[in-house]
Amino acid sequence: MKFKNFIAIICFVFLCGHSVLAQSSINEMVKEWERAKAYTKEYLDAMPDSGYALKPTADMRSFAEQMLHLTEANYGFASAATGEKSPIVRGEAEKAADKSKSNVTKMVMAGYDFVINNMRKMSPTQLNENVEMFDRFEMTKSAALAKCFEHQTHHRGQTTVYLRLAGAKPPQEKLF
């Protein structure tokens, strides 16, 4: 009987510990997204108003379009991963008529808030649920959010060149 109680206690401690670790994982993800939001804001602030229309070559996106593409994907990935309906229609952000510094900044920050606020609502169990992305890629919701993070990092990184071409100094790396 004592052995059964011991096993029951061990199982209980393990399950509680696992739950705490999983919740910790969500908290860490939120912390990373908050850092990414702040870092992206530094990029948006560093670009002069006149640089928002800058295209390194004719066939590339402008700085504003890069940032709007980043936020478009943030909404899309996060909506699929969290199950929350995106407040914007697919393609709407990138096609925004107002590509001014103030409007782009407002839209991009709102996109980060959508991701962060909806991640906070997720349970650890939901992170392990599967979701199909773009009607062909099956992955866990956690993996979808990681892909989203990778995507925003990629496009923010691309804008470093835009800042330099505009004569602006890119923000220092913000790993922590």
Where are the regions a protein language model picked out?
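Acidic/histidine-rich alpha-helical segments that form the ligand environment
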Residues: 96-132, 140-151
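Hydrophobic alpha-helical segments, especially transmembrane helices
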Residues: 3-5, 19, 38, 157, ...
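Residues within well-ordered alpha-helical secondary structure of globular protein domains
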Residues: 12, 46, 69-72, 110
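Short, contiguous alpha-helical
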Residues: 30-34, 41, 49-92, 132-176
